[in-house]
Amino acid sequence: MIFIDRINRILDDRIDMKFWGVRGTLPVSGDKSLKYGGNTSCMTLEFPREQFFIFDCGSGIKNLGDSLVAQKRKDIHGKIFISHPHWDHINAIPFFSPLYMQGNDFEVLGANQSDITMREMVSAQMDGVYFPITFSQFAARVYFHDL
């Protein structure tokens, strides 16, 4: 019985890592992108007990969101780390469907830039001018912390 308990513990402590996008600057499509994919930066680490980390919000985060919805995941509690606020690392935040689902909560962490906070950088791209849906329409709870 002890051996089975040890095996179960090892399996329970598994970390899942997935790359949803690895490109820089612009997403691409076509034969040249088949090997590594065409989406811009997004990677996830999922730990036991539903700890969920997202690194960057390039175009790959759209597929991540679609996958979470297809799995019927609810009450997602995640941390989103933004490595730096270049467009290819934040431009797909408005397309991450779990942000529009009540019961989810996300903490967004990243470095401020001069006098601009991470919250200001993210919400600026969703001010109604650049994107038709505003930041206030997220149904999930979203918290920001500048590092």
Model-found features: residue ranges?
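Binuclear metal-dependent hydrolase catalytic cores
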Residues: 1-147
